[in-house]
Curated annotation (Swiss-Prot):
Cross-referenced HAMAP family: Formyl_trans
Protein name: Methionyl-tRNA formyltransferase
Keyword Kinase in record: no
EC number in record: 2.1.2.9
UniProt entry tagged with the keyword Metal-binding: no
Organism for this UniProt entry: Desulfovibrio desulfuricans (strain ATCC 27774 / DSM 6949 / MB)
Keywords in alphabetical order: Protein biosynthesis, Transferase
Positions annotated to bind (6S)-5,6,7,8-tetrahydrofolate: S116, I117, L118, P119
Length: 337
């Protein structure tokens, strides 16, 4: 029978996604977490005060030693890590490059929790890209537990798990995958300790890349199908945010204006056949925008400099007296310059 706390683990991670794995490892009877590595404290918030990472906060709560080197390329940092004599390096969204000398340190393996079904969506933004690209019915996202190699997210895979994308935003899918990854990580570490873990090489011909998102990735393209627009909006929620600009026509007691908005996921409505994509209409309660095939009713909206609000509040406030029916068009911020 295996002894308790016989797996010496150095955990490496930084954001909330990684904290889920650390929390689960701390509850695993075999885990002896000898150290937690996380990125240095960074300025955050309006005051730009130094803030601890989610992983550091949890490690301190758990009473685990914390190391925060700016790099692991130097001999001193590597010697400090080697002194922990890890059986495994358990890595999740750490954010620092691990040199070959570091990858060779653990007795069993350096293992990474990656939020995609590899070899698909290697890179920095697999969760957001999975939602944005997963607009077709039955689309799924997942987790891969892989052995870390010298190439980004290209190492052999020990285990995978998946879940339906459904109506997830990238924010809600992030949380679901963090928990799934934490469970799979413990399973793989147990298999490694028992000598039954098998890592399967990835098929390079199927590899795709999930590039980091920028603000422009949130500019909504209303010429696409409503399902694709809905997936784009969910994929960039909460960050970097789905953005459009309403160009509204003048009417009785209403001056023509342009209104930039960040929009939350809404609902797909009836066909918009015969209506130009981007056309805006309202019925006094909701604002809908014509996509390439159907109308899309907006969810919560956030005008510039304001907080999220129901569309009804916007229509009763800033857009009071906006003529009902088709009343303008929506364009991307780039097209509105």
């Amino acid at each position: 029978m295996a002894q308790e706390k016989d797996c010496r683990i150095v955990f490496m991670g930084t954001p909330g996604f990684a904290a889920a794995s650390l929390r689960r490892l701390a509850a695993w009877p075999r885990a002896h977490i000898v150290a937690v590595y996380t990125q240095p404290d960074r300025p955050a918030g309006r005051g730009q005060k130094l803030a601890m990472s989610a992983v550091k906060k949890l490690a301190l709560e758990l009473g685990i030693p914390v190391c925060q080197p700016a790099s692991l390329k130097g001999a001193e940092a590597q010697a400090e890590l080697a002194a922990f004599r890890p059986d495994v390096l358990a890595v999740a969204a750490y954010g620092l490059i691990l040199p070959d000398a570091v990858l060779d340190m653990p007795r069993l393996a350096p293992v990474n929790v990656h939020a995609s079904i590899l070899p698909g969506l290697r890179g920095a933004a697999p969760i957001q890209r999975a939602v944005m690209e997963g607009w077709q019915p039955g689309a799924r996202a997942g987790i891969s537990i892989m052995r870390i190699g010298s190439r980004l997210d290209a190492g052999p895979v020990y285990a995978m798990g998946d879940t339906p994308i459904g109506e997830h935003t990238s924010g809600s899918l992030h949380d679901a995958l963090a928990e799934l990854g934490a469970e799979l990580l413990v399973t793989v570490l147990d298999d490694l300790m028992e000598g039954r873990a098998v890592a399967v090489e990835q098929d390079e011909s199927l590899a795709t890349h999930a590039a980091k998102l920028g603000k422009r990735d949130g500019y909504i393209n209303w010429t696409r199908s409503a399902a694709e627009a809905h997936a784009q909006i969910r994929g960039v929620t909460p960050r970097p945010g789905a953005r459009t600009v309403l160009h509204l026509d003048a009417g009785t007691d209403f001056e023509a204006r342009s209104m930039p908005l960040i929009v939350s996921p809404g609902t797909i409505g009836e066909t918009a056949a015969g209506t130009a994509p981007g056309s805006v209409r309202h019925d006094g309660q909701d604002i809908s925008i014509a996509c390439g095939d159907c109308w899309y009713t907006l969810g919560m909206v956030r005008p510039e400099g304001r907080k999220d609000m129901p569309v009804r509040d916007l229509l009763n406030g800033s857009l009071k007296n906006l003529p009902q029916g088709v009343c303008g068009e929506a364009r991307s911020p780039e097209e509105s310059l």
